[in-house]
């Protein structure tokens, strides 16, 4: 991660850093690759992660980014679902992988996801990415029983926002 080129994105309250996002962006591919959202110790539960996420997506949407990808730990799934994410695969750590068009606001992201339920093609990444995501599945991972259980529970929790089946083909349009 080259943080000289991609400085962490910080949220300050009363001149104090309260939350940070670590991500890289590519102007060539118009992708944001988000690595981590951190709320500093003692600042949890005050909505700062949502504040920084909201500012972050608005900033990068306005800067011309088109898609965002990230891995979401099972313990963070509920929060990410509130922000309009969909999920395709499971990474080597058992986190759920999201890759989708970037919208300017959380509400627009949620509205987009609801539309994608009826028209999944609008959310699909490019073919090369789809092929890579197909290779990332719970069954192929060497995870502990505890991790596998947490991952399966996260997949159950995301419910209809688990878009993995669409990596293998799209249903007939529901319109």
Language-model segment annotations:
Residues 8-10, 23, 57, 98, ...:
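Small side chains
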């Amino acid at each position: 991660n080259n943080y000289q080129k991609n400085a962490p994105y910080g949220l300050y309250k009363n001149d104090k850093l309260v939350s940070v996002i670590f991500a890289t962006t590519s102007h060539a591919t118009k992708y944001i690759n988000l690595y981590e959202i951190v709320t500093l110790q003692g600042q949890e539960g005050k909505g700062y992660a949502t504040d920084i996420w909201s500012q972050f997506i608005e900033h990068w949407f306005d800067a011309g980014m088109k898609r965002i990808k990230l891995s979401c730990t099972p313990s963070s799934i509920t929060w990410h679902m509130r922000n309009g994410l969909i999920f395709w695969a499971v990474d080597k750590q058992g986190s759920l992988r999201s890759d989708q068009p970037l919208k300017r606001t959380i509400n627009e992201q949620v509205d987009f996801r609801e539309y994608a339920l009826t028209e999944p093609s609008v959310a699909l990444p490019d073919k090369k990415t789809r092929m890579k995501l197909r290779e990332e599945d719970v069954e192929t991972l060497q995870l502990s029983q505890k991790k596998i259980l947490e991952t399966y529970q996260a997949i159950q929790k995301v419910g209809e926002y688990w878009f993995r089946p669409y990596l293998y083909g799209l249903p007939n349009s529901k319109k």
